[in-house]
């Protein structure tokens, strides 16, 4: 298998309510591909990113959908044909982690909405995640009706009908609903078939200057490592365009906070690419699509604990501006999604909002609010270009709730 085939080429989000089986489904789809390459970097990414790569394959003498598999050999021991490798982004289903799901959505090309057949539809986060996909504009959706092994036929049909009426009028209205059991690996072939049809690999420009969205960052050194053996900090994310190569000089924006004689300002970080990982392999270059790990020359204390998540990475001098405030056009939802479902009131001056721009989440205070427009001053700046989509969350009770979408002017 060539390195090119092995590299993931598309990012698929797994979204849905907590405990509906997203992580178990990832395990079923990853098949016999386990941690064969347990290098430190990959260990770090898979722990932090909540992601797994899966290679979809075809058994040559069996027609689809039954011929789809994730196994390297068919029933008679014959090798299977590789179709493509995909990266699954496992978005947290817990409501307090909604910001993480939104920042993950920035690097998704499509999504599998996982809904448990054992519970009524919709549960709170199922609804909130679907609304987030709608808002961010992820149109390629497949629905996995999970845990069918735990219900009888009548309940499975009732659940299917509930899902159908729930997605009516949303981005997932025409999405196929595939009944599966992640635990028993039932109908995984049908799910792969639906993903292959509904979530194609998008066309991307690999010949322009590279752009990577950082979704995670970490220190891969074990406690007690001597300074001679220290590895540089690692960034995990997705290349949206161009090629990233080992040895390349890179810039990170908005960078880091620096105290300049009592004045705090944000300065870009310049470093170099020391190593790259994609599809579980060390590679010399990463092309768009899929998730990758970038080993850098940065002090690992700068990258530990996701402290560089939300940065944009590229060639020095090619990145969008760093913004400490911006104006956005605002489109509000009709109602607040979640438990305290109520009408969304207009945004008012002085109110705090949680904003997700790309993979960056920040809090901003509204300095001016007009009809369909708001100016915000950010607590932590973002690097973003005009036209970027912004997920807007408001504090409702003790929680942040999704209330609308902004477009950066």
UniProtKB/Swiss-Prot annotation:
GO terms for cellular component: cytosol. Residues 90-93 are annotated as: G3. Mg(2+) 1 binds at residues 23, 46. The keyword Hydrolase applies. Keywords: GTP-binding, Hydrolase, Initiation factor, Magnesium, Metal-binding, Nucleotide-binding, Protein biosynthesis. It holds the Pfam family GTP_EFTU. Heterotrimer composed of an alpha, a beta and a gamma chain. NCBIfam families: eif2g_arch (TIGR03680), PRK04000.1 (NF003077), small_GTP (TIGR00231). This is Translation initiation factor 2 subunit gamma. The lineage of its organism: Archaea, Methanobacteriati, Methanobacteriota, Stenosarchaea group, Halobacteria.
